[in-house]
């Protein structure tokens, strides 16, 4: 694991082992009994899986010092996006297709959404 010290690698592997044990301690329920009994067992199993997932997230975040999930990418507002069609409009050229640019000024692509 690049960029880490050996100690933190060992701690991370230990945390992964703990998480694996947690998931192995909650096997999927057997398909026996009445429909209602099976449904109840699956419902309880899903609740335990949810708890295990939350515990696993807490273990990983304490081990890594940050959340396990990546930070979502911030996208620019839609009002600033437009398709640049000034060079090759209607020619069918491949290089003009799908090229969107962000401009400094605001272009209205669609109306305000109200019907007139």
From Swiss-Prot:
A Pfam family: REV
Homomultimerization, as annotated region: 18-26
Primary location class: host cell
Sequence motif Nuclear localization signal and RNA-binding (RRE), location on chain: 34-50
Keywords: AIDS, Host cytoplasm, Host nucleus, Host-virus interaction, Methylation, mRNA transport, Phosphoprotein, RNA-binding, Transport
Biased composition (Basic residues): 36-48
Compartment(s) where it occurs, according to its Swiss-Prot or TrEMBL record: Host nucleus, Host nucleolus; Host cytoplasm
GO molecular-function term, one example from the UniProt record: DNA-binding transcription factor activity
Magnesium keyword on record: no
Record-listed Phosphoserine modification sites: 5, 8, 99
Region named Disordered: 26-48, 89-116
Amino acid composition bias (Polar residues), ranges on this chain: 98-116
Modification(s) after translation: Asymmetrically arginine dimethylated at one site by host PRMT6. Methylation impairs the RNA-binding activity and export of viral RNA from the nucleus to the cytoplasm.
Protein's GO biological process: mRNA transport; viral process
Entry domain remark: The RNA-binding motif binds to the RRE, a 240 bp stem-and-loop structure present in incompletely spliced viral pre-mRNAs. This region also contains the NLS which mediates nuclear localization via KPNB1 binding and, when the N-terminal sequence is present, nucleolar targeting. These overlapping functions prevent Rev bound to RRE from undesirable return to the nucleus. When Rev binds the RRE, the NLS becomes masked while the NES remains accessible. The leucine-rich NES mediates binding to human XPO1.
Family according to the record: Belongs to the HIV-1 REV protein family.
HAMAP family (alphabetical): REV_HIV1
Job of this protein: Escorts unspliced or incompletely spliced viral pre-mRNAs (late transcripts) out of the nucleus of infected cells. These pre-mRNAs carry a recognition sequence called Rev responsive element (RRE) located in the env gene, that is not present in fully spliced viral mRNAs (early transcripts). This function is essential since most viral proteins are translated from unspliced or partially spliced pre-mRNAs which cannot exit the nucleus by the pathway used by fully processed cellular mRNAs. Rev itself is translated from a fully spliced mRNA that readily exits the nucleus.
Miscellaneous remark of the record: HIV-1 lineages are divided in three main groups, M (for Major), O (for Outlier), and N (for New, or Non-M, Non-O). The vast majority of strains found worldwide belong to the group M. Group O seems to be endemic to and largely confined to Cameroon and neighboring countries in West Central Africa, where these viruses represent a small minority of HIV-1 strains. The group N is represented by a limited number of isolates from Cameroonian persons. The group M is further subdivided in 9 clades or subtypes (A to D, F to H, J and K).
Protein name: Protein Rev
Originating species: Human immunodeficiency virus type 1 group M subtype F1 (isolate 93BR020) (HIV-1)
Underlying gene: rev
